[in-house]
Amino acid sequence: MEIELAKSYGFCFGVKRAIKKAEQIKDAATIGPLIHNNEEITRLWKNYNVKTLNDISELSTEQKAIIRTHGITKQDLEKLKQKDIEIFDATCPFVTKPQKICEQMSKEGYEVVIFGDENHPEVKGVRSYVSTKAYVVLDEKELFDIKLPSKIAVVSQTTKKIEKFMEIVNFLMLKVKEVRVFNTICDATFKNQEAINELAKKSDVMVIVGGKNSANTKQLFLIAKNYCEDSYLIENEKEIQKEWFSGKEKCGVSAGASTPDWVIDLVLEKIKEYTKIN
């Protein structure tokens, strides 16, 4: 069986930057997981004593705090600054961008439509910078019954599909007098999605590696599933089942933006081991 890696996969710029920062800082706490990958979070805790807290209120004896790649809310940032603690900001610059846009557009009197999951930490952070009114939606249908203002700015969660973003933008262009559109979907997301789209079309089994709480990884899985019915989302090599590859000729492999190379390598080794048996 042939195994092919997607042309673009794995660690993005923002995640690489955050991991490097955490390894250099050491002996620190992050507010929420630094990235959405349990394997890497465990490695940082064991090797660098970087632990994960659920909330700022859990900070006690820690001397250093790292802000997660997804960012935190404006209000939580203010709370953190009031603590007697050294702060290191690992927010991805691609996430900081929509935060700044929302803050500026609000000052100019625009209400803001955010394409994203309202429960995702990145979206919570971005929304907190809107001082007018924010509408968080996953579909243009959610805007049908809303009385929209004459001025709207539109941003997206960085890991969403560009096609869906455009559907929302097109709807608003027909309904609102003035629409300011900011494409805040990051380049790595676009490249990874494009690559898995291409690979899934020519594979008869797909394995996507990444955190099951990772938005970008789940998006890759959905794209793969659309073209390859036998697509599987796993966090590590232990979840792989050899039956997946029975009678298959080509296995495509991709990974989310928070998935480290060492995890991907273990997955590839396990697939090779199982396909030798077949």
Curated annotation (Swiss-Prot):
Enzyme class, broadest EC rank: oxidoreductase
Reaction equations catalysed: isopentenyl diphosphate + 2 oxidized [2Fe-2S]-[ferredoxin] + H2O = (2E)-4-hydroxy-3-methylbut-2-enyl diphosphate + 2 reduced [2Fe-2S]-[ferredoxin] + 2 H(+); dimethylallyl diphosphate + 2 oxidized [2Fe-2S]-[ferredoxin] + H2O = (2E)-4-hydroxy-3-methylbut-2-enyl diphosphate + 2 reduced [2Fe-2S]-[ferredoxin] + 2 H(+)
> Record's family?
Belongs to the IspH family.
Cofactor(s) this protein cannot do without = [4Fe-4S] cluster
Gene name, Swiss-Prot/TrEMBL: ispH
UniProt protein name: 4-hydroxy-3-methylbut-2-enyl diphosphate reductase
List keywords of the entry alphabetically.
4Fe-4S, Iron, Iron-sulfur, Isoprene biosynthesis, Metal-binding, Oxidoreductase
Described by its record, this protein's role is as follows: Catalyzes the conversion of 1-hydroxy-2-methyl-2-(E)-butenyl 4-diphosphate (HMBPP) into a mixture of isopentenyl diphosphate (IPP) and dimethylallyl diphosphate (DMAPP). Acts in the terminal step of the DOXP/MEP pathway for isoprenoid precursor biosynthesis.
Pathway noted in the entry? Isoprenoid biosynthesis; dimethylallyl diphosphate biosynthesis; dimethylallyl diphosphate from (2E)-4-hydroxy-3-methylbutenyl diphosphate: step 1/1; Isoprenoid biosynthesis; isopentenyl diphosphate biosynthesis via DXP pathway; isopentenyl diphosphate from 1-deoxy-D-xylulose 5-phosphate: step 6/6
